[in-house]
From Swiss-Prot:
The active site is at residue 40. Its main location: cytoplasm. It is found in: Cytoplasm. Homodimer. Keywords: ATP-binding, Cytoplasm, Ligase, Nucleotide-binding, Pantothenate biosynthesis. It comes from Rhodospirillum rubrum (strain ATCC 11170 / ATH 1.1.1 / DSM 467 / LMG 4362 / NCIMB 8255 / S1). This is Pantothenate synthetase.
Length: 282
C-alpha cells in the first residue's frame, strides 16, 4: 500500500493543490477529527466519485469542545488514520497543528444563525461557532470543489450548507448517509468509550428512533410519540436524554405534526458518560 503524503503547513498543502488545479483536476475535501472508522472512509469514497483528487484533513479542533467535554481524551492515532485514508483512496492528508490553525492573536469566529440554534446548538454553547470557523479556514486553504460531511452530525451539515450559501462559496457540500453497525448503532469515534455492557445497550437508540418515526407516520400525535421515545430510552438505560425532536429536514424548524415534506427525527442521549447522537429521515 502506498504511503499517503501528509501536508502539515499551508504552504505544503497549497503546493499540492495548486498543482492539481493547474492540471484542471477537481478537488474534494473530507474534514475529520481523526479516530477514523468505516463511516469516515465512506465519505472519502463518496468524494472520489465526484472529483479527481481528495484531501482528507485530520484536526482535533479545540474550539468546538466545551470546557467539560472530551478534547483531551479524544482518541488520536495519526499513523492508523493515514493508513486507512490511503487504503480508501485519498490523495493527501492535511494534518495541521493547533498553532498552525490558530496562530497567536487569532480572534475571528464565524456564527451561522438560525440552523445552529436549538438541539446541540443550545446544549453545547460555542460548538457550532468552532465548527464553522475551522471549516471555513479549511475551505479557504484547500479551495475544494466538493466537500463531504456525514449526515450523522445532521445539524452540523445544515450549518455548513448555510455557511457556504451565505458566503457565496463555490463549493458543493454533500451529505453522506449514516453508516451503521449490523445492529443499527451509528458509527462514531466516541463509541470506543462504551463499556461492553453499554455497547450492548447502544443500538436501542436507533431502534427507538425507528419506532417513534413509524408511529408519527402512522398518525400518532407527535408530542405523544416523542414523550414515549424519551421514556423508552430511559427504560433502556439511557440518560439524561438531551433531546428527541422532530424537525424540518431543510430548516430544522420544529414540527408539531407529521411532516408533509422531508422531516428529520433527531436525538442526543447519554449512555453512561458517553453522549450518543443519531437521526433518521421521516
Amino acid at each position: 500500500m502506498r504511503a499517503l503524503p501528509i501536508a502539515r503547513s499551508v504552504s505544503e498543502l497549497r503546493a499540492v493543490v495548486d498543482g492539481w488545479k493547474a492540471e484542471g483536476l477537481r478537488v474534494g475535501l473530507v474534514p475529520t477529527m481523526g479516530a477514523l472508522h468505516a463511516g469516515h472512509l465512506s465519505l472519502v469514497r463518496l468524494a472520489l466519485s465526484k472529483v479527481d483528487r481528495v484531501v482528507a484533513s485530520v484536526f482535533v479542533n479545540p474550539t468546538q469542545f466545551g470546557p467539560n467535554e472530551d478534547f483531551a481524551a479524544y482518541p488520536r492515532d495519526e499513523a492508523a488514520d493515514a493508513a486507512k485514508l490511503g487504503g480508501a483512496g485519498a490523495h493527501l492528508l492535511y494534518a495541521p497543528d493547533v498553532a498552525g490553525m490558530y496562530p497567536p492573536g487569532f480572534s475571528t469566529t464565524i456564527t451561522v444563525s438560525g440552523v445552529s440554534s436549538g438541539l446541540c446548538g443550545d446544549l453545547r454553547p460555542g460548538h457550532f461557532q468552532g465548527v464553522a470557523t475551522v471549516v471555513a479556514k479549511l475551505f479557504l486553504r484547500v479551495r475544494p470543489d466538493v466537500a463531504v460531511f456525514g449526515e450523522k452530525d445532521y445539524q452540523q451539515l445544515l450549518v455548513l450548507k448555510r455557511l457556504v450559501n451565505d458566503l457565496d462559496l463555490a463549493i458543493e457540500v454533500i451529505g453522506a448517509p449514516i453508516v451503521r453497525e449490523t445492529d443499527g448503532l451509528a458509527l462514531s469515534s466516541r463509541n470506543a468509550y462504551l463499556s461492553a455492557e453499554q455497547r450492548a445497550l447502544a443500538p436501542g437508540l436507533y431502534r427507538t428512533l425507528r419506532r417513534v418515526g413509524a408511529d408519527i407516520l402512522g398518525g400518532g400525535r407527535v408530542d405523544d410519540c416523542l414523550a414515549w421515545g424519551i421514556d423508552e430510552l430511559k427504560a433502556l438505560g439511557f440518560g439524561p436524554v438531551d433531546y428527541l425532536d422532530l424537525r424540518d429536514g431543510a430548516t430544522l424548524e420544529r414540527l408539531d405534526d407529521a411532516p408533509e415534506g422531508p422531516g428529520r427525527l433527531l436525538c442526543a442521549a447519554y449512555l453512561g458518560k458517553t453522549r450518543l447522537i443519531d437521526n433518521i429521515g421521516v
